[in-house]
Design a protein with these regions (language model features):
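C-terminal motif of bacterial Sec signal peptides marking the signal peptidase cleavage site
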Residues: 20-26
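Bacterial N-terminal signal peptides that target proteins for export
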Residues: 2-14
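Primary mode marks residue(s) on the alpha4-beta5-alpha5 output face of response regulator receiver
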Residues: 30-62, 67-187
């Protein structure tokens, strides 16, 4: 009877590594159906698409006394907190209050809302067009971004249950996802 040979554990390591790499091909952020962007959210003439990023994070709200009322409360928006991934799923930056988009290389822009459109279905935060200005490094991934579109939003609305006076100061972190489409001047 011929001797049987079995793979040595050391020879399995490269095979397992290759299998893991092959599986990472499916680790990309989900690509939503083609997004039809309303005319109101189109970037200004003279700007071209730089890149699309996928945000995953939370929209943060705080229970506050409602201005101009006696005893009424509301969930007030504080800001987002999200990671930004590229089309391969690699985290390339973060998004936070300002609203700000900051790349891992230190380049950063802050935005001002120019247009707002309710999303299809109305069950998530609005789609936006924001004009941006550079407040970070002069060079880098986000250094030349001049406009940002927020589209394909999921979730992020304030809690449906009103907050009570006893909850003033408490925060609610509501999951959300969105596509951020970055534009830069055409050179």
């Amino acid at each position: 009877m011929p001797a049987r040979s079995f793979p040595r554990p050391a020879s399995l390591v490269p095979c397992m590594a290759l299998a893991a790499l092959a599986a990472c091909g499916t680790c990309k952020p989900p690509v939503p159906p083609t997004v039809v962007v309303p005319e109101d959210l189109k970037p200004p003439a003279g700007e071209t698409l730089q890149r699309t990023l996928w945000a995953t994070g939370v929209q943060i709200y705080e229970c506050r006394a409602k201005a101009g009322t006696t005893g009424a409360t509301e969930w007030a928006f504080l800001g987002p907190e999200a990671s930004l991934a590229d089309d391969k799923g690699a985290i390339v930056g973060k998004h936070y209050a300002g609203p700000s988009w900051e790349a891992g290389d230190g380049s950063k822009v802050v935005g001002t809302v120019k247009a707002r459109v309710d999303p299809p279905g109305g069950t998530s935060i609005p789609w936006l067009l924001l004009e941006t200005r550079n407040v970070g490094k002069a060079q880098g991934q986000f250094a030349h971004v001049s406009s940002v579109q927020r589209v394909a939003t999921e979730g992020g609305l304030p809690p449906a249950t009103p907050c009570a006076a006893a909850e003033i100061g408490q925060k609610a972190r509501v999951d959300y996802k969105a596509q951020y489409v970055l534009y830069a001047p055409t050179f």
